[in-house]
Amino acid sequence: MARHGDTRSPSPVGSTYSSSRRSRRDDDRYEKSRREDGRGHRRSRSPERRYRDRDRDRESYRRRDRSLDRRDDYRNDGGYRSNRRDRSRDRRRSRDRGDDRDHRRRSRDRDYRSRRDDSRDKARRRTDDSADLKHKSRRDDSRTRDLDSKSRDTSKPSTPAPAAQTEDEKRAERLAKLEAWKQKQAAEKERKQREAAAAGGARSILEEIDRKSGLSPAVGSPKSPVTPTTDATPAPYAGKFDPKAIKRNAAPTPSAPLVLGNDVAVPQIAKASATFSSMNNHAQANKPAAALSTAPSTLKSKRNVGGFGLGAKQVADAEKPSAVKTLGFGEEESTRKKLERLPTPPLEDGKDETVAADMGAEDEDDDMQDGETEEENAAAARAAAERREERLQNEALRAQSSEKVPQTNGDVEMNDAPIQAEAENMEVDVEEEDVDPLDAFMSELAESAPPKKTFGTKFSKAKEQQPEAMFGDENDVDLTAVGEGDADDFLAIANKAKKKKDIPTVNHEKVEYEPFRKKFYTEPSNLAQMTDEEAASLRLELDGIKVRGVDVPKPVQKWSQCGLGVQALDVIERLGYESPTSIQSQAIPAIMSGRDVIGVAKTGSGKTVAFLIPMFRHIKDQRPLDNMEGPIGLIMTPTRELATQIHKDCKPFLKALNLRAVCAYGGAPIKDQIADLKRGAEIVVCTPGRMIDLLAANAGRVTNLRRVTYVVLDEADRMFDMGFEPQVMKIMANIRPDRQTVLFSATFPRNMEALARKALTKPIEIIVGGRSVVAPEITQIVEVRNEDTKFVRLLEILGNLYSDDANEDARSLIFVERQEAADALLRELMRKGYPCMSIHGGKDQIDRDSTIEDFKAGIFPVLIATSVAARGLDVKQLKLVVNYDAPNHLEDYVHRAGRTGRAGNTGTAVTFLTEEQERYSVDIAKALKQSGQQVPEPVQKMVDSFLEKVKAGKEKASASGFGGKGLERLDQERDAARNRERRTYKTGEEGEDEEEKEDKAEKADERFNKALSSVQSAAAAAPTLPGVPKGIDLDGKITVHRTEKDPAGTSKNPLDKVGSAVADIHARLSRAGVMRSGVPIDNRGPDAGAYHATLEINDFPQKARWAVTNRTNVAKILEATGTSITTKGSFYPPGKVPGPNENAKLYILVEGETELAVTNAMRELMRLLKEGTIAAADSDARAPVGGRYNVV
């Protein structure tokens, strides 16, 4: 119902002004009447005066309380109901007078009359503005504006007896109306029961229960009666027991009631549900206050109910005056204790909650009218009670019809109900039932509800979503739809991204790079005055520095001449670097001048500091890094150990210069390195493989090379060999072209120089002490021994070293060729009592790092390693290096021996050679000669023997430098190992790619075999002549022939020469047109090679013949093998045979100086022939030649 100035706040907002004005006007008359009548505080007072009296009660006027007690004493004559009223009065006194009615609504105690006086005024305003004129006209004349004393005397009877009589008359009238309403509701209920009869057999039992309870006034869930506000005689109670008795007779006898208090059944509450719907609120509105007060544990265990307005609703319903309440049923307390069966809580979130909140608000408004006279209470609450009772009747019927399982007793057992089933049932019922007009009307009223009243409703709606989220069908469908269908696609994408570790090529013409400064060096005056001759003599003094290039700066002699900052000079002084070394004195000015540099110097000569100091100056000149910008200085190394050592050398300078460096290498967790790079770092020390991984990680968002302007390649010869050169060049291609690039190494073969110069621009080459020279401080010992005597000799060397007390803290490093040999030697030395460890590429990176740290710290004195530790390992106490297995080339020997004798210290390098390793003796002897040491006689014999074999063509001279075996071989080995693991621990997913590859390879072989069979069949179709091949085996053994030479002791008689020539001609004519496999028909003459082989290609398809004869493929083979390839003979169609004087069938002649070169060339030609045959077979299969029909 709409109210004028309606507000849910206790403060009189709507009518305060008018009420107070009328109260002041009538104040004198009111005091006079109160003096005339001692009962001046009775309820027949006008609303205006009562409103004024409330203010006085709050301040100092206390006679009101006495009159209230007197009024309650007057009620005590009623007997049983007076006890109820006494409890209500006590509750009122204990209630808080706070302004927050919402707090009162959610309060857990049942004391509800804290704002009695305010509620009087609120109810008074409500009744004044009510649209219900019918009830208003029936009120006493004391409600009118006429305040004459006669009306006051009439409205305020002097004795209780006439008032009680008037009350009885009105109750009789209300009973008649109630009976008429019950009949109307019974008819409506029967109609709805007939509509719900189609629900099936499960509802037939419920219909019986409904029919049984149809005669009871409690079936429609009317409001439980509350004690009337005025006293009454005991006479009407007898007739008011009948509805209760009827209700008890209609309800089935409880078979196993669950008692809470005396006879109160525990309501069934969904355990998992966090909220109650409006149906629960409607049903629980029937609970009397007595039942609630006797069962505090139930509501306290569900204290969140108060947040949804349910607790307040129960209290309010127990208090409010209704049409039934004013009837005064006799033992109404026992009636209150009887609980009705609760409906199943639905999971609706819309209309019903709003209705419940609004009805709760209405109930509270009705509560406020209790302080008035009984007539005013009844008139004000009648309309609300009728609406509420009708709505509760309909909702209870709806809830009962929705019950799937009938209850056999009147009580409700406390069982946990399945929420999902309840939700489904209630959804069906909501669809079946039409929208009730009263519900629609109350929904409209809910729009005008103040925010305080709707707060509980909003909270209820938020909570109510939880069961839907857990058990809703729609969410389940969504969860099923996501992720399942595309799982294979995601895995395929992930595998594809994982396999493709590639970085995009940058088009530098389209990128705008920031300008930067390279040149920081200003030549000091004393160096500028130095002549060229003086500079040359200075370089000669500094270990014979050799320079190549244009405008090479003169070498410096002091750190102060390098143009460094104060911080860098302080660090250098703190580290104890007195003066620059030879490579530093020449390299630092050259790099600081902005030039590209190739620096070659002996091991342990300070090359690392030579490129680090200019880099710090280079970085500090540029602006700081922004977020997600890559490094400025990039240092690449071939091994992880060298990367960690360079990073360690950087640290003293980083803190002083406020720079950051990241060491990125394989084997370590990449996530840590990604985190460091995202935080920002001006310097990155890395290995090429891990750097490519980082550049490709996360679609290139981890780091980039746009800010890189200073690049260092340490151990550059190893970086540019066959293994690392593709990776290094891929990284270099993504760096700006005008960068400054520096290359350093202790060894730099000539064949590596051409590759390195591709990455440099007009470089300055600085060589100190030779390209690949062992430092003169190292004593080199080379011994030729059998394999079984090497270990005994090793024990002897170690024993001699550690027998001297001066070498107690010495370290020994033993190099072997293979990882298995390292572990085997470790086992043998441990048995002999030497504490040692091994390090090689097969170990985890963390083990390698910890092993080197322990070795440097002296935890164990002996370290067994492969060549992975040959570069960059710097141990000051290392005095002995043993090459247990001889190094396979000069550079490796130099680096191995260079682990000792560092920074001016002395050391010893012992090398064991076996008779089978004479190939490696050449490089070792060369190293001994270049370092000024004598070559042992056994070693020299091995060198001479090997050189003779090379001249005879039996051996091939070993190439200088690290001729790496390439990354493809490593990838193949890793893939093979991974495939073995996958086959061993197969889960059904991993092996699919490998199986597909195997299938493809099998299909290719099958196609080739088919094509080859056609070639063989064509050859077999030809007439068989002597020497014609019956089949060609491209995968078979290659036959290489030595070229025939004239006998040394031939006769000088001309007739003999003529005879031999004639015989040769006849022999050749007899073989005309015939060429057996591997036998040439003409391979003589001055240009003939020492070895030759032939390959007939006449009967192969045209694509196959083209593959082995086109100029591009032949040129590649010629460059790779150094052989001569000639196409000879003539092509003959299948089935045609060359005549006696005709050329032989088309074939290829391969000539070379060594058998190995010819074999390699033949193998490559056979591979091309095989690929061409397969391609021809595929094209024939795709486009068959000829049609289906022939023209006759």
Curated annotation (Swiss-Prot):
<feature type="compositionally biased region" description="Basic and acidic residues">
    <location>
        <begin position="966"/>
        <end position="989"/>
    </location>
</feature>
<dbReference type="Pfam" id="PF00271">
    <property type="entry name" value="Helicase_C"/>
</dbReference>
<dbReference type="InterPro" id="IPR000629">
    <property type="entry name" value="RNA-helicase_DEAD-box_CS"/>
</dbReference>
<keyword id="KW-0547">Nucleotide-binding</keyword>
<feature type="compositionally biased region" description="Basic and acidic residues">
    <location>
        <begin position="96"/>
        <end position="155"/>
    </location>
</feature>
<protein>
    <recommendedName>
        <fullName>Pre-mRNA-processing ATP-dependent RNA helicase prp5</fullName>
        <ecNumber>3.6.4.13</ecNumber>
    </recommendedName>
</protein>
<feature type="short sequence motif" description="DEAD box">
    <location>
        <begin position="714"/>
        <end position="717"/>
    </location>
</feature>
<feature type="compositionally biased region" description="Basic and acidic residues">
    <location>
        <begin position="24"/>
        <end position="89"/>
    </location>
</feature>
<dbReference type="GO" id="GO:0008380">
    <property type="term" value="P:RNA splicing"/>
</dbReference>
<dbReference type="GO" id="GO:0016887">
    <property type="term" value="F:ATP hydrolysis activity"/>
</dbReference>
<feature type="compositionally biased region" description="Polar residues">
    <location>
        <begin position="400"/>
        <end position="410"/>
    </location>
</feature>
<dbReference type="InterPro" id="IPR014001">
    <property type="entry name" value="Helicase_ATP-bd"/>
</dbReference>
<comment type="function">
    <text>ATP-dependent RNA helicase involved spliceosome assembly and in nuclear splicing. Catalyzes an ATP-dependent conformational change of U2 snRNP. Bridges U1 and U2 snRNPs and enables stable U2 snRNP association with intron RNA.</text>
</comment>
<dbReference type="InterPro" id="IPR011545">
    <property type="entry name" value="DEAD/DEAH_box_helicase_dom"/>
</dbReference>
<feature type="binding site">
    <location>
        <begin position="601"/>
        <end position="608"/>
    </location>
    <ligand>
        <name>ATP</name>
    </ligand>
</feature>
<feature type="region of interest" description="Disordered">
    <location>
        <begin position="957"/>
        <end position="1003"/>
    </location>
</feature>
<dbReference type="InterPro" id="IPR001650">
    <property type="entry name" value="Helicase_C-like"/>
</dbReference>
<keyword id="KW-0067">ATP-binding</keyword>
<feature type="compositionally biased region" description="Acidic residues">
    <location>
        <begin position="360"/>
        <end position="377"/>
    </location>
</feature>
<dbReference type="InterPro" id="IPR056149">
    <property type="entry name" value="PRP5/DDX46/KHDC4_KH"/>
</dbReference>
<dbReference type="GO" id="GO:0006397">
    <property type="term" value="P:mRNA processing"/>
</dbReference>
<feature type="region of interest" description="Disordered">
    <location>
        <begin position="315"/>
        <end position="416"/>
    </location>
</feature>
<dbReference type="InterPro" id="IPR014014">
    <property type="entry name" value="RNA_helicase_DEAD_Q_motif"/>
</dbReference>
<keyword id="KW-0539">Nucleus</keyword>
<keyword id="KW-0378">Hydrolase</keyword>
<feature type="short sequence motif" description="Q motif">
    <location>
        <begin position="557"/>
        <end position="585"/>
    </location>
</feature>
<comment type="similarity">
    <text>Belongs to the DEAD box helicase family. DDX46/PRP5 subfamily.</text>
</comment>
<keyword id="KW-0507">mRNA processing</keyword>
<keyword id="KW-0347">Helicase</keyword>
<feature type="compositionally biased region" description="Basic and acidic residues">
    <location>
        <begin position="167"/>
        <end position="195"/>
    </location>
</feature>
<feature type="domain" description="Helicase ATP-binding">
    <location>
        <begin position="588"/>
        <end position="766"/>
    </location>
</feature>
<dbReference type="InterPro" id="IPR027417">
    <property type="entry name" value="P-loop_NTPase"/>
</dbReference>
<feature type="compositionally biased region" description="Basic and acidic residues">
    <location>
        <begin position="384"/>
        <end position="393"/>
    </location>
</feature>
<dbReference type="GO" id="GO:0005634">
    <property type="term" value="C:nucleus"/>
</dbReference>
<dbReference type="Pfam" id="PF00270">
    <property type="entry name" value="DEAD"/>
</dbReference>
<feature type="region of interest" description="Disordered">
    <location>
        <begin position="1"/>
        <end position="241"/>
    </location>
</feature>
<feature type="compositionally biased region" description="Low complexity">
    <location>
        <begin position="226"/>
        <end position="238"/>
    </location>
</feature>
<dbReference type="GO" id="GO:0003724">
    <property type="term" value="F:RNA helicase activity"/>
</dbReference>
<feature type="domain" description="Helicase C-terminal">
    <location>
        <begin position="793"/>
        <end position="943"/>
    </location>
</feature>
<dbReference type="GO" id="GO:0003676">
    <property type="term" value="F:nucleic acid binding"/>
</dbReference>
<dbReference type="Pfam" id="PF23469">
    <property type="entry name" value="KH_12"/>
</dbReference>
<feature type="compositionally biased region" description="Low complexity">
    <location>
        <begin position="8"/>
        <end position="20"/>
    </location>
</feature>
